[in-house]
Amino acid sequence: MATILIVVLLLASIGVGYGLRAKKHSETLAQARKAAEKIIEHERQKTKAEVAEYEKNSVQETQQYQETIDQELADDLHDNQRKEAWIEQRMNLLNQKKIVLTNRADALAKKRQSLLQERDNVRTTLGEAKQLITDRWNKLQEVADLEEQAASKLVLKETKQDAIRSKDEFVNNAQTELESSCEREAEDLIALAMEHSDVPRGQAENHRSFIAENAEYLGKLIGNSGQNVRAIEALTGVDIVIDDQEKEVILNGYDPVRRAVAMETMEMIKTEKRVVPDTIERLVNKANKVIDQRIRQYGEDAVRELKLKYVAPDLIKFIGRMHYRTSYGQNILEHSIETAKLAGIFAVELGEDATLARRAGLLHDIGKSIDRDIEATHVELGVELTTKYRESPVIVNTIASHHGDVEARYVIANLVEAADAISGARQGARSESVADYIQRIKSLEEIANKHPEVKESYAIQAGRELRVIVQPKETDDKTIHSLATNVKNQIEEDVTYPGQVKVTVVRKLEIVEYVEKKQA
């Protein structure tokens, strides 16, 4: 009985526990549903807020994008208007040039018509002269009863004189008009070339002096007992003078490339913590490489700017070296580029090869890039260099003739000579003052005039040549050689001059006798 009771109680307990568990499960499930509904509602509200925020941001971004597009369209419209104005301006300029060319063509046509009319007039005059001969012939035979041969000689003589006078008058008038026309054409051509010339007017680089930043830098530069400065001087061949009070460092040396290497070395010293002679040697080697790279880059840029065809790599290096050369303060490379552009414009106007003219203009002063310790003029060095690299005979003749030493055999040689003169003579191209120029000219002439056998002397070609006229009776052909040598040596000692000075001694003896008419 007890066992049955226990079983019944156990079953009742199990039933009660199952019921309680089911009730708890139901409550838990209900709570989970409520929590899920809250989460879903929260996410729904969050999503709704995010959608609203996104829509708001989208409107703002769309508005900003629209404003950006409107601004870009306005800028493009402004640029297009500016370009249209520029195009219209260029079209007006081209129309003006077209009008000028048309007027020039009309003037040439009128000139041709005038010459044809003049030719007809000459023919008419000749016909009248022939008729005059016939009339005079008949009149002389009738009036003077001269013989046929005598009358013929007289008539021919008078007619010949009249024809010569008419011819001379016609030739003089034509020559005067031709010279005037040529001058106008030359002025127009030069004005057109200068209008299109856009070479920068930069100053030549200063590789002669600079101010030290501080005493620490001067200490590294000078080194222990000046050993660093001496190392730089020995490796670069440049003399260095240091003013301790002004903190100025001055570089003295004829070769501007070496001065550039020395300057680059001193610039590199600034970043070195410890500087000794071994450091100087390493920096000088590095500076040499840097300057070599710059030289080649200058040459390649010049060739590329002028749109030239193949140029020998070694010749490009000589072109780049011209950047470090100056003449009266004018950078030789910039001067050569400007000369090349002017010569190219001249060539186009005259129907010549513009590319060849630009090449000749770039290379006309190439001899100035060679070391100055070589005993030769820059013209001779340039001829030798371009011949070595097989440049055109036109270019070789251009270099040889651009200072008038030899005759210019090609039109391009004359064009480069004119462009060279324009580039060097324009205002601001060269920095030598008028006072210095006049003093140098006077010094050259005074050196020659000190010699008793000298009659007079002239410094010509801006001081590039000294022409000495001697007394012919006080000298002979042998003594003038020693005179030229003495004048040359004195100029080298007493005068500071750029480039070369040519000394020319002239001895000329004229003997004139007069034959007087005998009295009858």
Curated annotation (Swiss-Prot):
Segments forming domain HD: 332-425
Top-level division of the source organism's lineage: Bacteria
Keyword Acetylation: no
Keywords carried by this UniProt record: Cell membrane, Endonuclease, Hydrolase, Membrane, Nuclease, RNA-binding, Transmembrane, Transmembrane helix
TM regions (residue ranges): 7-23
Domain KH: residue ranges: 206-269
Entry GO terms, CC: plasma membrane
Topology class, membrane: Single-pass membrane protein
Major location (coarse): membrane
Keyword Cell membrane appears in the UniProt entry: yes
Similarity remark: Belongs to the RNase Y family.
Function: Endoribonuclease that initiates mRNA decay.
Protein's name according to its UniProt entry: Ribonuclease Y 2
